[in-house]
Amino acid sequence: MNPATQLADGIATLGLSITESNQARLLQYLALIQKWNRVHNLTAVREPEAMLALHVLDSLAVLPHIGGSRIADVGSGAGLPGIPVALARPEWRVVLVESNHKKAAFLQQARIELGLENVEVIGERMEGVRSNAGFNTVISRAFSDLADFVKLAGHLCARGEEQGTDCGRLVAMKGVYPHEELAQLPETFIVDNILSLTIPGLRAKRHLVVLKRAGQ
């Protein structure tokens, strides 16, 4: 199956609507990762078909479960899930936070080449980033531990009064159900939802853990 067909079929299976032009930009993004990967080792996945499923479709699968006008992707790495999210939802403002200089340089180049006017790249450690308004969604697939995610990125979540009606959410992209991590969750954040996701082309388990501030 060629990449364009694989992508279109995957998007349809996920029940998403993404314009043809933005599907083409998603494929352009994939090609850009492959190009940079030869030198900078952005991802251990090398095979294009696997990369499309493991990175692009895996990122797009979160779309029905996140929202708000301001999204932060912390520990963004190669721009996952932030760049696919930004391409699929150009009306959202997406901030990519990545402290590794080579990866941050890739993100800046991708932003320019893909014409991502709704994307900002911050080349700093996430715990040092400050946002006056806070973010509706702070998402990451970089963390192996939920407690670390809360500790380092929790301050970026908008508080209820800043949102008008609701507080922001921390959203962690996980593999198997994280029983042990949930048991160690700090008291400052509680579970809002845990969703099991099916990714087209992947057999591996995927879960989305949604956290909110305790008391909000």
Curated annotation (Swiss-Prot):
InterPro entries: rRNA_ssu_MeTfrase_G (IPR003682), SAM-dependent_MTases_sf (IPR029063). Belongs to the methyltransferase superfamily. RNA methyltransferase RsmG family. Specifically methylates the N7 position of guanine in position 527 of 16S rRNA. SUPFAM superfamilies: S-adenosyl-L-methionine-dependent methyltransferases. Keywords: Cytoplasm, Methyltransferase, rRNA processing, S-adenosyl-L-methionine, Transferase. S-adenosyl-L-methionine binds at G75, L80, R141. It catalyses: guanosine(527) in 16S rRNA + S-adenosyl-L-methionine = N(7)-methylguanosine(527) in 16S rRNA + S-adenosyl-L-homocysteine. Disulfide bonds: none annotated. GO terms for molecular function: rRNA (guanine-N7-)-methyltransferase activity. This is Ribosomal RNA small subunit methyltransferase G. It holds the Pfam family GidB. The lineage of its organism: Bacteria, Pseudomonadati, Pseudomonadota, Betaproteobacteria, Nitrosomonadales. Its EC number is 2.1.1.170. It comes from Nitrosospira multiformis (strain ATCC 25196 / NCIMB 11849 / C 71). It is found in: Cytoplasm.
